[in-house]
Amino acid sequence: MGKIHRPRKGSLAFSPRKRAKSIVPRIRSWPKETEVRMLGFAGYKAGMTHILMIDDEPGLTNGKEIFMPVTIIETPPLRVFGIRAYRQGYLGLETAGEVIVPDFELDNYTPSKKGKGRKFTFYQFLGRRIATLPKDYTQEEFEQKLGALEDMIKEGEIVEVRALVSTQPWVIKLKKKPEVMEYAIGGTSVEEKFNYIKEKLGKEIRVGEVLKEGELLDVIAVTKGKGTQGPVKRWGIKLRAHKDSKGRRKVGSIGPWHPARVMWTVPMAGQMGFHHRTELNKRLIAIGENGKLVIDGNEIEITPKGGFPHYGIVRGDFMMIAGSVPGAIKRIIRVRPAIRPPKKKPPVQRPQITYVSVESKQ
């Protein structure tokens, strides 16, 4: 008789399979880098297309033209609006303080006909996400708080500083409410990380300033929601026999007589999708500007004929990432440099692209 080998259906590693707390994904771990840069970026998923490229990774197809499905993520510039400092606590890092920039007039928002002639400030949009923004917050108060934070760093009380950033979806005419998140900074000392954020406070950061074409990224997002699904779709259990009694898309047994209870490991119906997921080592194929990709000196519009379904036109900067990424169209997608890269890494440069499909995806 052959070896009986039947692993259980579905992974228990992601249990409980419940909805994510927030549609904005969290990054709990950061790679350690000596280069002083922001460790990641964020954008909005536009859709997928495919390209032909010369394979530059070691293997059988090296130097040959290969087909590659790619995901387009539109990345309007992020606005650095604050700095958060951490001290070492008994159970880990503790917030020691934070400083945000005072309000200022926006120069990248194009109002509708009703809003023509009006001035719009950054706090008007940030206030849609953060309800506790300070009122009558002056430049002097800002500089005073920043100086106090700098003194804490010199005294050695601070062990980590991170940048508070806001997305600017109004730049690409997607929506007005921004997403707010925190990004770690690469570097060897707290002082150089602090100086990097201090220089960027109140300014925009574009994706090309942070990430390099060809490098490996980890993609963090909330997956598409599927609602309540049965055990066959949710866990991948086997369909029961044709003449089985009392249902076909059910588990045959929910457990033994004893222990006299239903174990948590039994595949059951329930929530599927809208889960927080991280996918490792996705290659950043290319970075484009103004919705265009430059190939051999020629500008190619990345938007397919008729626009990306349910998204429309890519107007600003964008990332082209190899393969698929989790999340629905228009959903916020976060990336960071690969925290667990393979030993054989592809070269950190854009591969030679010979063709980009802009045929209709309708």
Swiss-Prot record:
Residues 351-362 have a biased composition (Polar residues). GO terms for biological process: translation. It comes from the Archaea. One of its GO terms (molecular function) is structural constituent of ribosome. Residues 340-362 are annotated as: Disordered. One of its GO terms (cellular component) is cytosolic large ribosomal subunit. The keyword Ribosomal protein applies. InterPro entries: L3_arc_euk (IPR045077), Ribosomal_L3_dom_3_arc_sf (IPR044892), Ribosomal_uL3 (IPR000597), Ribosomal_uL3_arc (IPR019928), Ribosomal_uL3_CS (IPR019926), Transl_B-barrel_sf (IPR009000). Keywords: Ribonucleoprotein, Ribosomal protein, RNA-binding, rRNA-binding. Part of the 50S ribosomal subunit. Forms a cluster with proteins L14 and L24e. Belongs to the universal ribosomal protein uL3 family. NCBIfam families: L3_arch, PRK04231.1. One of the primary rRNA binding proteins, it binds directly near the 3'-end of the 23S rRNA, where it nucleates assembly of the 50S subunit. This is Large ribosomal subunit protein uL3. The gene is rpl3.
